[in-house]
Regions:
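Hydrophobic anchor at the beta1->P-loop junction of P-loop NTPases
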Residues: 11
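Conserved substrate/cofactor phosphate-moiety recognition/catalytic segment
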Residues: 27-68
């Protein structure tokens, strides 16, 4: 698993940047997609009264995200041969920890180095016009922008090339992705 897998594409970005909407459109277009770990984990933890939440135990939250992302990666390996799109990837976990001022444990760093995706990673930049807070997204726009910067730095540190998506309609974002993925 140490070689980049050219058909596995990550769509990343700070909260409220439109990436999940874009992933839904990719799914509707017939592509295999994974769902975002963070939101699902928050919903599950709230439902069971758990504490692995970004506002309670960030390290535990990161561990659950790592497990989720590794499982998604393994599941999607069976789709190789056609483009697959992930709503975030393993390096997002390291970026989250860095953003929180926490050390990145060696096993998370190792996972980000071994589980490789296409070298080009799509990033949805901060977009104030569409940013909204909700029950799971408690960050301010400034925090979302800081998250985006942490993602850029982290992905570059792991050897990825960031491709910024346009601040445009979902259809235009799909066109930008198609121009690269074929």
């Amino acid at each position: 698993m140490t070689e980049p897998t050219d058909t596995l594409f990550i769509v990343t970005g700070g909260p409220g940047s439109g990436k999940t909407t874009l992933l839904a459109a990719l799914s509707e277009a017939g592509f295999a997609t994974s769902i975002e770990a963070g939101r699902a984990i928050i919903q599950d933890q709230v439902a069971i009264g758990g504490h692995a939440l970004p506002w309670e135990d960030r390290a535990a939250f990161a561990e659950l995200m790592l497990c989720w992302e590794m499982r998604s990666y393994r599941e999607m390996l069976g789709q190789v041969g056609r483009p697959v799109f992930f709503d975030r990837g393993v390096p997002d976990v390291a970026a989250y920890l860095r953003l929180c001022g926490l050390a990145v444990p060696s096993h998370i760093d190792q996972a980000a180095r071994l589980l490789r995706y296409n070298r080009r990673v799509f990033i949805a930049p901060p977009w104030p016009e569409i940013f909204r807070q909700d029950a799971e997204r408690k960050q301010s726009f400034a925090e979302a922008a800081a998250t985006s910067q942490a993602l850029v730095t982290t992905y570059q540190d792991y050897g990825y090339e960031l491709v910024s998506l346009p601040l445009a309609s979902v259809a235009e974002r799909l066109e930008a992705i198609s121009a690269i993925t074929g």
